[in-house]
């Protein structure tokens, strides 16, 4: 779990920005969104193959 220590006199906006960077870097929100709903294995497989096809077409 990322944490940020706010120093005396440091703006809260800066601390929030640092926290957001840490959360993005660790992929916490992405993982939470992925586990929001259950996806059947067939749906996951279909999405994976679709993403691979999109990547190959570039």
UniProtKB/Swiss-Prot annotation:
Transmembrane segments: none annotated. The keyword Ribosomal protein applies. GO terms for cellular component: ribonucleoprotein complex; ribosome. GO terms for molecular function: structural constituent of ribosome. Keywords: Ribonucleoprotein, Ribosomal protein. GO terms for biological process: translation. Coiled coil: none annotated. InterPro entries: Ribosomal_bS21 (IPR001911), Ribosomal_bS21_sf (IPR038380). It comes from the Bacteria. Residues 43-58 have a biased composition (Basic residues). It holds the Pfam family Ribosomal_S21. Residues 39-58 are annotated as: Disordered. Belongs to the bacterial ribosomal protein bS21 family. This is Small ribosomal subunit protein bS21. It comes from Chlamydia felis (strain Fe/C-56) (Chlamydophila felis). The lineage of its organism: Bacteria, Pseudomonadati, Chlamydiota, Chlamydiia, Chlamydiales. The gene is rpsU.
